[in-house]
């Protein structure tokens, strides 16, 4: 399965990890210096959930991000799914 949230459309994107060396100025050094940057992939926090939709009277199984779960808790499952176009 793809790593995409069906509510928000969140998907993996590229990021960087920065490697630093040296002692911080606060600790008496001359400062931290960037020695290398490494490409990495940042993944969304996806959860596979069974959401109860009272209007339909059944569970709907979906792969959603943690932020989308908060949206469902705030606006209700039926309204959120209808707005996205899944119902």
Curated annotation (Swiss-Prot):
Belongs to the bacterial ribosomal protein bL28 family. Disulfide bonds: none annotated. InterPro entries: Ribosomal_bL28, Ribosomal_bL28/bL31-like_sf, Ribosomal_bL28_bact-type, Ribosomal_bL28_sf. The gene is rpmB. Signal peptide: none annotated. This is Large ribosomal subunit protein bL28. HAMAP family: Ribosomal_bL28. The keyword Ribonucleoprotein applies. GO terms for cellular component: ribonucleoprotein complex; ribosome. It comes from Akkermansia muciniphila (strain ATCC BAA-835 / DSM 22959 / JCM 33894 / BCRC 81048 / CCUG 64013 / CIP 107961 / Muc). GO terms for molecular function: structural constituent of ribosome. It holds the Pfam family Ribosomal_L28.
């Amino acid at each position: 399965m793809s790593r995409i949230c069906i509510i928000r459309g969140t998907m993996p994107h590229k990021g960087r990890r920065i490697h630093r060396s040296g002692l911080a100025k606060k600790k008496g050094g001359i400062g931290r210096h960037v020695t290398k940057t490494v490409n990495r992939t940042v993944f969304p926090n996806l959860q596979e959930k069974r959401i109860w939709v009272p209007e339909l009277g059944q569970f709907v199984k979906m792969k959603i991000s943690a932020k989308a779960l908060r949206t469902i808790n705030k606006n209700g499952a039926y309204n959120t799914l209808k707005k996205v176009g899944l119902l």
